[in-house]
């Protein structure tokens, strides 16, 4: 039977259509996915992300451990509260998960990992943490609400006390701060400003209701997916998995190659892949009628006249742009156009960088 977050009752009261999402009953939408999408782009919406897993790591060798566990380098994290995004790789360079890591003190870091990968992540982290003497605490006592949109921070701040408002004042993106019983982070999965707020389970429902009363619209998984796709953000299991290199998933920027003597899991395999080349992730735009869908083939002819085929990893209709967009993993050598087979029609698509909307504006 699927698990319920502490906000399950609030979703039903708000009229949500609930679906099983990787073993969790989660809201798909509250009536109109399109309306929810636009609300986040133009005002403020919120998502229950309590199904994600918060993992606290403590011990004198925590930084050393994370420099080995992750492809990105936590040596960059020197200011308390600063976060970074990283892949956690296997020995062959495949992505076990993508996650966010927060630094608080030398002996206290926090990870936020995906729900679909929870059990394998915890097993992998525990296995590799043992030699470093790390104390691992899974924070199942916390719920998490993502408040996103151009007015999200202002609307959320109306619920903060003076100390909390002071704690987040001027906080840059990718920071988190514990302020009273709220952990408030300037992170998100929509391409908009906002907060991801972790708080005790027993306080989550009241906080959610107060946000609703403050004019923040509840949003479901449907809008979350179209928003993240417009923003060019990867979804684990689609853009990457344990068989796909971060180099083939537009995650090359998350690999810290320097210092050259840092040994991290998957480094050797990545160095070979970097030398020989991998597929790459691109954006596709189709302004003609129709919708680009996951797993459709993408065909193109390179400059030498050779034919190649890739695959759409995520595709949808973009509510912000009014036409279809997709992320696709393709061989190198793709030009500015390609062909996607939709049923029995060959549809021309424009090849772009894998990002379509930033701060509510088209970039593709």
Curated annotation (Swiss-Prot):
Keyword annotations from UniProtKB, A to Z: Aminotransferase, Transferase
Catalytic reaction annotation: N(6)-[(R)-S(8)-aminomethyldihydrolipoyl]-L-lysyl-[protein] + (6S)-5,6,7,8-tetrahydrofolate = N(6)-[(R)-dihydrolipoyl]-L-lysyl-[protein] + (6R)-5,10-methylene-5,6,7,8-tetrahydrofolate + NH4(+)
Any one GO molecular-function label of the UniProt entry: transaminase activity
EC number per UniProt: 2.1.2.10
Pfam family, one: GCV_T
GO biological process, one term: glycine decarboxylation via glycine cleavage system
Leading EC class: transferase
Keyword Transferase among record annotations: yes
Keyword Transferase among record annotations: yes
GO cellular component, one term: glycine cleavage complex
InterPro entries, alphabetized: GCS_T, GCS_T_bac, GCST_C, GCV_T_N, GcvT/YgfZ/DmdA, GcvT/YgfZ_C, TrmE/GcvT_dom1
Assigned protein family: Belongs to the GcvT family.
Subunit (UniProt): The glycine cleavage system is composed of four proteins: P, T, L and H.
Function: The glycine cleavage system catalyzes the degradation of glycine.
Listed name of the protein: Aminomethyltransferase
Species, as recorded: Escherichia coli O157:H7
Organism lineage: Bacteria, Pseudomonadati, Pseudomonadota, Gammaproteobacteria, Enterobacterales
């Amino acid at each position: 039977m699927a698990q319920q977050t502490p906000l399950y009752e609030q979703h039903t009261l708000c009229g949500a259509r609930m679906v099983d999402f990787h073993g969790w009953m989660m809201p798909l939408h509250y009536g109109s996915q399109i309306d929810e999408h636009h609300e986040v782009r133009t005002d403020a919406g919120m998502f229950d992300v309590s199904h994600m897993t918060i993992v606290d790591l403590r011990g004198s060798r925590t930084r050393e451990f994370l420099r080995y566990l992750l492809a990105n380098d936590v040596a960059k994290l020197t200011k308390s509260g600063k976060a970074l995004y990283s892949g956690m790789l296997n020995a062959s360079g495949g992505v076990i998960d993508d996650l966010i890591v927060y630094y608080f003190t030398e002996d206290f870091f926090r990870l936020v990992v995906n729900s679909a990968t929870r059990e394998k992540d915890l097993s992998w982290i525990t296995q590799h943490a043992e030699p470093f003497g790390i104390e691992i605490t899974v924070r199942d006592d916390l719920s998490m609400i993502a408040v996103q949109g151009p007015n999200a921070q202002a609307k959320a701040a109306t619920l903060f006390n003076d100390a909390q408002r002071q704690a987040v004042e001027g906080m840059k993106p990718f920071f988190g701060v514990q302020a009273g019983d709220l952990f408030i982070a300037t992170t998100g999965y929509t391409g908009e400003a906002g907060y991801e707020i972790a708080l005790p389970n027993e306080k989550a429902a009241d906080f959610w209701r107060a946000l609703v009363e403050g004019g923040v619209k509840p949003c479901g998984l449907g809008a979350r997916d179209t928003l993240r796709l417009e923003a060019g953000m990867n979804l684990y299991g689609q853009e990457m998995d344990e068989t796909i290199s971060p180099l083939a998933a537009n995650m090359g920027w998350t690999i810290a190659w320097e210092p050259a003597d840092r040994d991290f899991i998957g480094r050797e395999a990545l160095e070979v892949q970097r030398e020989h080349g991998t597929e790459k992730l691109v954006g596709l735009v189709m302004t003609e009628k129709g919708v680009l869908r996951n797993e459709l083939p993408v065909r193109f002819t390179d400059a030498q006249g050779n034919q190649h085929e890739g695959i759409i990893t995520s595709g949808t209709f973009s509510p912000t742009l009014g036409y279809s967009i997709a992320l696709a993993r393709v061989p190198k050598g793709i030009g500015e156009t390609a062909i996607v087979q939709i049923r029995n029609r060959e549809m021309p698509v424009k090849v772009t960088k894998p990002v379509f909307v930033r701060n509510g504006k088209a970039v593709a």
